[in-house]
Structure formats: structure tokens, C-alpha cells
Amino acid sequence: MVQTVYKNSDQTVFEDAKALFQLNKNILLKGPTGSGKTKLAETLSHVMNLPMHQVNCSVDLDTESLLGFKTIQTNEEGHQEIVFIDGPVIKAMKEGHILYIDEINMAKPETLPILNGVLDYRRQLTNPYTGEVIKAAPGFNVIAAINEGYVGTLPMNEALKNRFIVIEVDYIDGDILKTVIKEQSKLQDEQLIQHIIKFNEDLRTMTKQGQISEEAASIRALIDLSDLATVMPIERAVQRTIIDKLEDEREQQAILNAIELNF
């Protein structure tokens, strides 16, 4: 169960995601890194009262990471036997839970076609390791997330993308962001929160102009910044949570300039 829920001034984002979920449609959440896509998936899991099994994609993702693997175990009689340990895809299918595939476009294109039957009307998979045919139990749903244009991402296969309905998830701002900061961080100082929100607006503008990376303007970075601002000067909090993560000196300087303007 999540302690906090997804919030957005555009209420249709969550409403539409919930409606698609109830129609058993595959949902693809598309938006910048740190915009709350995983929080939206967690909130759906909470609202629908269904556990969520997560796959974190990378170029190293393989079939075993998705489906599971064979291993040797000792049974009750003390004999060793080969057993198959279900991975997140098969667990979610068998138990009628949610499968959440994070950063799906980080995976190599040749890794994902094995999910085609899972993602279409069949909701079915043949386990290549055991030959077992698995049909998804009622309640099974698929949510995936994509960070377009992010370093390391690959163009998403059109046949795969066509199996999803896309929902754009943008950064939150204004009063909604203020509420999120107060609920999810230790910072309660109204004036400082307003300064942080204005600072974040400047970061987002620089992100859109290509001056800094998306991660610098992410909601999770903002929550960390707000927490640290309760125990150290705001300038040092920004240094620790945002600037020190960046390698490019020009990006670092751009954020230092934004600090001078806002604090």
C-alpha cells in the first residue's frame, strides 16, 4: 500500500488511466523522468487493491529477468530437483496482478517480442523454459512507462507500441506541487516552498531549452531538496540533491545562476 498518492492538476490523467485499467487496456505512461509515472502506477495498484510486480528495463534485461529461471532445490525428501522460479511477468499473470514495466524503451528491441501474446487479446504466454502455457488470471493488467529522448533509450518498436494506449504524464506545478512537497517531505515553511516551486519552474524552462538534463527538474529531486532544506541552507541542499549529480559544468553553472535568482 502506498502512503502517498499521485496528484496532477489535470485530473483526466488519473481518471483516464483508471478507466483504461477497468477496460483491461494496456497503459503506456509517457513523460519526462521524475514526472510521477511510477507514482501513478502505484496509485492505480492501491486504488484497485491489486499488488504490482515491477520490471526495471535496461540493455541488460533478458528473458530470465522477465519470465523466471530454472534452479536446483532440495525437496522435502532431501532429494535435489530442478524447479522453475517464476519471474515478475509469470507471477503477475498467474495471480491476476498488475505488471509494471518501467522504462520499457531502455530494453533491447529483441528482448520484448516474447510479451506480444501477453499484451494482446490472448493474454497468454508459452514459457520457453518449461513449455507451460500460461493464461492470465482475471485482474491481470499491464502498465508500462517510457522516458522519450532520455539518454540510453531506444525507439520503441511500433508493433509493441500499438498494443498500448498512451497517456502523457507531465510535471506537476503550482498548488498541486505545493501539496506534494508538504505531504511527501518534511518541509512545511510556506515561503521557502514557494521559492522552491519558482526555482523548479526555472529548472523546467532550462530543461525544455536543452540547457540541463530532465533529471535535474524531477519531482523526486525536488522532494529530496525539500527534505534537506530542513537541516541545511537551501544553497547546499540544491548542491547535494541536484548539482552534484551533474557532470556537465555548464549545467552546474546554469543551476547556480538559478539559485542566485530565487533564494
Curated annotation (Swiss-Prot):
Coiled coil: none
Sequence positions that bind ATP: G31, P32, T33, G34, S35, G36, K37, T38
Keyword Ribonucleoprotein tagged: no
InterPro entries registered for this protein in UniProt: AAA+_ATPase (IPR003593), ATPase_dyneun-rel_AAA (IPR011704), CbbQ/NirQ/NorQ/GpvN (IPR050764), CbbQ_C (IPR013615), ClpA/B (IPR001270), P-loop_NTPase (IPR027417)
GO molecular-function terms, A-Z: ATP binding; ATP hydrolysis activity
Key words, A-Z: ATP-binding, Nucleotide-binding
PANTHER family associated with the record: MAGNESIUM-CHELATASE SUBUNIT CHLD, MOXR FAMILY PROTEIN
Similarity section: Belongs to the CbbQ/NirQ/NorQ/GpvN family.
Descriptive protein name: Uncharacterized protein SERP0979
Lineage, uppermost ranks: Bacteria, Bacillati, Bacillota, Bacilli, Bacillales
